[in-house]
Amino acid sequence: MTDSFPFSVQESVPLSRFSTFRIGGPARYFKELTSVSEALTVFSYLHTHPLPYIIIGKGSNCLFDDQGFDGLVLYNNIQGQEFLSDTQIKVLSGSSFALLGKRLSSQGFSGLEFAVGIPGTVGGAVFMNAGTTLANTAFSLINVEIIDHSGILLSIPREKLLFSYRTSPFQKKPAFIASATFQLTKDPQAAKRAKALIEERILKQPYEYPSAGCIFRNPEGLSAGALIDRAGLKGLKIGGGQISEKHGNFIINTGNACTADILELIEIIQKTLKKQGISLHKEVRIIPFRL
């Protein structure tokens, strides 16, 4: 069947290898993207050959099904960057967002210090408008290049894109994010701030276990983690999944968790908080076996 594709495709690739949860069955088809030109070829093909597909980066915000995915998984590994001016940098979407923040802050550039503790790709950060309480991706963003559903490369300035808390226009109108350009400022204190941010995250978050980061978006003016803590749910365990004792908004894989374990814990949290009149909305992407 892979012979029918005009590009190389693998079959039955375990998605647990591409998830920070370390959970997930095999992808029916799997394609690693390593250049924008390759991505253009793939999306042009998909425009005329409908096939269920998903795009993943580092899998840091995904929960795959134990059965895997019955379609094509596109793994974005398109990396690279270039300075367009002294304080503007264009970054390809498969690049590590955390490493980008670390490198730039160590070189005396401010604007993306918050990225040091966010374990996804640049494309994923734009898609989710990833951030912290201090800043988010859209703050420093000045341009995005995308490949639209018909396989055409487009350049979109920031002012034409509407972002909000953990929300981008690409969540409602899917497109492949090819690159992002950021505006930086020179600041010798940037490295110090980045170091403090990562130290705080290590102290407060369960990095020693596989997880997908924060499971829920924070309700306006509230902390989802604190709400879960006050509800007495920290430490609750089902199968190999557990609500972290370190941070209530993290569900961790203690070693042998399956998708059902994680979903059951998510449901328990939502139902418990709903009884208190609080609706928690998932930040993690739940990717089913079939779309």
From Swiss-Prot:
- GO terms assigned for molecular function: FAD binding; flavin adenine dinucleotide binding; UDP-N-acetylmuramate dehydrogenase activity
Key words of the record: Cell cycle, Cell division, Cell shape, Cell wall biogenesis/degradation, Cytoplasm, FAD, Flavoprotein, NADP, Oxidoreductase, Peptidoglycan synthesis
Where, subcellularly, is it found?
Cytoplasm
Principal localization? cytoplasm
Highest taxon in the source lineage: Bacteria
- EC number(s) on file: 1.3.1.98
Q: Which reaction does it catalyse?
A: UDP-N-acetyl-alpha-D-muramate + NADP(+) = UDP-N-acetyl-3-O-(1-carboxyvinyl)-alpha-D-glucosamine + NADPH + H(+)
Q: Where is the active site?
A: 166, 214, 283
Q: Which InterPro entries match?
A: FAD-bd_PCMH, FAD-bd_PCMH-like_sf, FAD-bd_PCMH_sub1, FAD-bd_PCMH_sub2, MurB, MurB_C, MurB_C_sf, Oxid_FAD_bind_N
Cited Pfam families: FAD_binding_4 (PF01565), MurB_C (PF02873)
Required cofactor names:
FAD
Q: Where is the FAD-binding PCMH-type domain?
A: 22-187
- Cited Gene3D superfamilies: 3.30.465.10, UDP-N-acetylenolpyruvoylglucosamine reductase, C-terminal domain, Uridine Diphospho-n-acetylenolpyruvylglucosamine Reductase, domain 2
One GO biological process from the UniProt record? Answer: cell division
- Spell out the GO cellular component terms annotated for this protein, sorted alphabetically and separated by semicolons: cytosol
Query: According to its UniProt record, in which pathway does this protein act?
Result: Cell wall biogenesis; peptidoglycan biosynthesis
Which EC class is this protein assigned?
oxidoreductase
> What function does this protein fulfil?
Cell wall formation.
Provide the family line: Belongs to the MurB family.
Q: Do you know which NCBIfam families this protein is assigned to?
A: murB (TIGR00179), PRK13905.1 (NF010480)
- What is the name of this protein? UDP-N-acetylenolpyruvoylglucosamine reductase
Question: By which gene is this protein encoded?
Answer: murB
